[in-house]
Amino acid sequence: ARGTTEAICANALISAVLGTRLPGPGTQYVSQNLRLLGAVRPGDRLTVQMQVSSKDTATHHVTLDCTCTSQEGVAIFQGQVEVVAPTERIERTRTALPEIHPDAQGRTGLQHLLAHVAHLQPIRVAVAHPCDVPSLSAALEARHAGLIEPVLVGPRGRLEAVATEAGLDLADVAIVDVPHSHAAAQQAVALAAAGEVEALMKGSLHTDELMSALVSAAAGLRTKRRVSHCFLLQTPAYPRPFIVTDAAINIAPNLEQKADIIRNAIELAQVIGVREPKVAILAAVETVSPTMAATLDAAALCKMADRGQITGGLLDGPLAFDNAVSIAAARIKGIVSEVAGQADILVVPDLESGNMLAKQLIFMGGAASAGIVLGAKVPVILTSRADSRDTRIASCAIALMLAHHYRLSPP
């Protein structure tokens, strides 16, 4: 709607300037008063100017005049913001996440992601039972993109029939002939355990079938962590890619399982370029309530981070979804947090809420996505039968990054 886009742009741009430039990292919002003056169109280049109009040295409150103009000099918004400036210089490493969403010039986020991993050599991937056109096509397209060297594990006759149906060439593709999907899952896992492949990819078999083979004690792929799934998402309305976890593997995780879910997500975020990811532990409310287990778990997980039991990220929770992704919503509710409004990772209470959240973002919110399983000795490319080609290829690119990371830091 008219005005909504401009309001979102205003909040995002002002927050970016305040948090990175003037006053810089550590700045806390107090209030803002902005007037929307013009419209924003796709492809516009906006310039924000901020100037200190007053400051109180006793309270460190600073008032800044703000103006935003388009490339044509048209005023988009103007007004004032009041903040509490940091009392000492804070430096944080600038990070650049691989984009996975189309930009205004028509370049797809997948193209950005492929460029981001172009310097990495492809990895051998066991593709378990790719006996339908989408899964077989995705494996071969990922090969063509230079991401993987697929080893197809399934009934040779069915694989060749699917290839013929889709006009795909299997002449130079390795095939391990097994009789059925259950054997395909076991053989794919065995290839990974033997070091013959560096990742697994789900084909047309059921997720439970592959995961059961993966986590079997006899398989040899388990680590000290519990396996969990991460959706890497990017929506038009949020300024950075983010992770939703766990929406596919752990149905009703307990406290220790949630800790592993967070550890896995932090590792993924760091691999894709976020040095210290901000982790929002979601619940329906942002206060701790004895009658809501999700809020108790969130509080305990934050204390675990305080005690060094979870490292590598900044944790806060419980946070309602709006407080986790909207600085304005967090400010209205009086939440002072380094995570609120700018989360890199959203930790959901259970699989049902996470799955619904992720799929709402994908199918109704226009989110681009990738899906990966962590916590085993090799990454697992785990996508849904309804996922797009771009989602499958993006998931392979994420697995490529993880596999190269595991060469240096085995899980």
Locations of regions flagged by a protein language model:
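Beta-strand segments within the central parallel beta-sheet cores of soluble alpha/beta enzyme folds
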Residues: 30-31, 65, 279-282
